[in-house]
């Protein structure tokens, strides 16, 4: 931009309207030069020369018709194209029209590209657990727990002292002896498939206890010890499994297992007097 200041004598001779010379333009080759005059922020008259490169391009019919619209208002007598007095030339903004499917894909990637919402439960990687490359290997904690449970169940089944068959109460040890110390006290309680779970938190409930053991095997009953006055958990519970091998699997899997910021202690339930 080059500053051009005229004298008052030149303005009188030229008889300029509002004190500014008229703008002019000329074309030389593939370039168009437009010369304009205006006042800057300091109130001084300046000369502005704009250079445009002429390019020929094929545009849609709607764009061509829009360029031939008749101007109105203060721009009624303007030449085709933008007028610097009413139009401000700026950088071009290219628009791209996409379909609904492309928009959904673009929107999902722009939600938070730096953060992955998927987290693997096996290796804590940024992918879904079903796609984990370590699934089924030694790093898979679920596989390790299942292996321990199956091994404990097999060991319990192979115990020669436990046949796994139903034994009536009168055929058990001392069941047929009359006058014994247990006579008249009802049937003896079978604790062979019961386990004791200790080091539980005070907020432990029956629902939490069932969620903890239901994946190991079916159980017949549960008992969660609670304080008489406050109703809070005393820290231990008893679970009677339907099968002894499931009880052995529970001891192998849950003993030393972290639950609610505590380390569980699971062992066989001792016979009650």
From Swiss-Prot:
GO terms for biological process: formation of cytoplasmic translation initiation complex; translational initiation. CDD domains: eIF3G (cd12933), RRM_eIF3G_like (cd12408). InterPro entries: eIF3_g, eIF3g_N, eIF3G_RRM, Nucleotide-bd_a/b_plait_sf, RBD_domain_sf, RRM_dom. SUPFAM superfamilies: RNA-binding domain, RBD (SSF54928). Belongs to the eIF-3 subunit G family. Component of the eukaryotic translation initiation factor 3 (eIF-3) complex. The eIF-3 complex interacts with pix. HAMAP family: eIF3g (MF_03006). PANTHER family: EUKARYOTIC TRANSLATION INITIATION FACTOR 3 SUBUNIT G. This is Eukaryotic translation initiation factor 3 subunit G-2. The lineage of its organism: Eukaryota, Metazoa, Ecdysozoa, Arthropoda, Hexapoda. The gene is eIF3g2.
């Amino acid at each position: 931009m080059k500053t051009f200041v005229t004298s008052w004598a030149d303005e009188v001779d030229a008889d300029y309207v509002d004190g500014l010379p008229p703008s002019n333009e000329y074309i030389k080759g593939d370039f168009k030069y437009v010369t304009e005059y205006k006042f800057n922020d300091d109130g001084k008259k300046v000369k502005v020369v704009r250079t445009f490169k002429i390019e020929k391009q094929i545009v849609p019919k709607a764009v061509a018709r829009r360029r031939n619209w008749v101007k109105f208002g203060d721009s009624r007598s303007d030449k085709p194209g933008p007028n610097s007095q009413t139009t401000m030339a700026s950088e071009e903004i290219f628009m791209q029209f996409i379909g609904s499917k492309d928009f959904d894909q673009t929107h999902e990637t722009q939600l938070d590209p730096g953060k992955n919402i998927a987290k693997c439960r096996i290796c804590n990687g940024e992918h879904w657990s079903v796609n984990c490359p370590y699934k089924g290997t030694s790093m898979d904690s679920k596989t390790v727990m299942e292996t321990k449970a199956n091994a404990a169940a097999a060991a319990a089944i192979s115990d020669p002292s436990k046949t796994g068959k139903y034994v009536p109460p009168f055929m058990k040890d001392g069941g047929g002896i009359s006058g014994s110390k247990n006579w008249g006290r009802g049937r003896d309680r079978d604790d062979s498939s019961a386990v004791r779970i200790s080091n539980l938190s005070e907020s432990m409930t029956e629902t939490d206890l069932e969620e903890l053991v239901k994946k190991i095997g079916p159980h017949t009953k549960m008992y969660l010890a609670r304080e008489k006055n406050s109703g809070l958990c005393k820290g231990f519970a008893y679970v009677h499994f339907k099968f002894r091998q499931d009880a052995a699997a529970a001891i192998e899997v849950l003993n030393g297992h972290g639950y609610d910021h505590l380390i569980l202690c699971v062992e066989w339930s001792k016979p009650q007097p």
